[in-house]
Amino acid sequence: DFAVRISGDSMEPYIKDGSRVYVSRMQELTDGDVGIFFVDGDMKCKQYCEDSFGNIYLFSLNRKRKDADMVVPASSGITVLCFGKVLLPKKPPLPRDF
């Protein structure tokens, strides 16, 4: 397990810019969990969802920053590496606007 400092406002109000979050490597992510990901050369803290076709959705919790959402199609060949689950008091709801 480890801690990481979050930069940016895309995860507010659940995770504030500059705050430190704790990450569990042992917990597998399920839809709606928040994780730390390495995608296309960038580290990201995002909410995770995967559909039945294997497409991965990485959401910003701050819906004013939905421009930072990512969709990684299963057929894209892009590797999404998850370093672990961010430990939050409760699981945030998945966005309704995707």
What are these regions (language model features)?
Residues 1-98:
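Acidic/glycine-rich C-terminal interaction modules and beta/coil loop segments
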